[in-house]
Each structure stands twice: as C-alpha cells, then as structure tokens.
C-alpha cells in the first residue's frame, strides 16, 4: 500500500480528554490500514502551551518519536526533555505525558501498538 500526503486526514482536537490546549493530528495510517495491529500511527503537532496529560497504557504500548522541536515528557513520573531524534517507549502498565513549553511547535510520531 502507498498512501500519498494528500490522502492523509488531518484532525484538530482542543481541550478534550487528555489533551490540554489544541493539537493537530495527521492520521498517517488508520487501524484498518495496519490490519488492526496498531490503533494509532499519527504525526502530532503540539503548539507551545499545549500538552497531553499523564495517562496510563493498559493492554497496549505507545511510542513517541520526536521529529521537530523540544518537549518535556514524563515517563512513569520521571521528567525529561526530548528533542528531534529522541524516542520514548511507554509499555503496558506504564504512564507518560508530553508538554510543549517552548516557543515553537513540537512535531512527533505517535504509534499505539497492541
């Protein structure tokens, strides 16, 4: 399967669930396109002042791969700064969050695996 950029759906989410502020999600692949082996494969843009609040992963795992910018993350209560090229894996039963306190957008790839 080849999917061209013009076929990638973009959604904006604001102050909903774990999201504080506004984020943009490029839904690169849908669960059906991944044969239901993953539930998310998105490029997320996190503007300055926005965050995805700490949340657990139960019966799944999530990967964040930073593409652009600088983000503050928590990994099971430990706070760290991540930059382009850095990756975080949150396994089953673990908690994480990501926030943008910089003056520039943060872009990252987010993938939830089953």
Give the location of each predicted region.
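Ligand-binding loop in jelly-roll beta-barrel domains
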Residues: 92-114
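Short, surface-exposed secondary-structure edge patches
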Residues: 43, 63, 77-81
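Glycine- and acidic-residue-biased ligand/ion/polar-headgroup-sensing regions
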Residues: 59-61, 65-71
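Short acidic-glycine-tyrosine-enriched beta hairpin
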Residues: 77-92
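A generic "binding-loop/recognition-motif" signal
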Residues: 48, 59, 78, 94, ...
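A short, N-terminal "cap"/entry segment at the start of jelly-roll beta-barrel domains
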Residues: 1-38, 53
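Conserved short histidine dyad/triad with adjacent acidic residue
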Residues: 28-30, 42-58, 92
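Histidine-centered metal-chelating micro-motifs
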Residues: 51-53, 72, 88, 92-97
């Amino acid at each position: 399967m080849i999917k061209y950029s013009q076929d990638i759906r973009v959604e904006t989410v604001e102050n909903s669930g774990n999201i504080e502020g506004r984020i943009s999600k490029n839904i690169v692949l849908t669960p059906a396109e991944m044969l239901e082996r993953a539930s998310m494969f998105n490029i997320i843009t996190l503007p300055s002042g926005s965050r995805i609040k700490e949340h657990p992963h139960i019966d799944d795992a999530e990967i964040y791969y930073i593409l652009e910018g600088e983000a503050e993350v928590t990994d099971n209560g430990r706070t760290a700064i991540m930059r382009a090229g850095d990756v975080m894996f949150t396994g089953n039963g673990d908690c994480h969050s990501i926030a943008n306190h910089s003056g520039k957008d943060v872009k990252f790839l987010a993938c939830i695996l089953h």
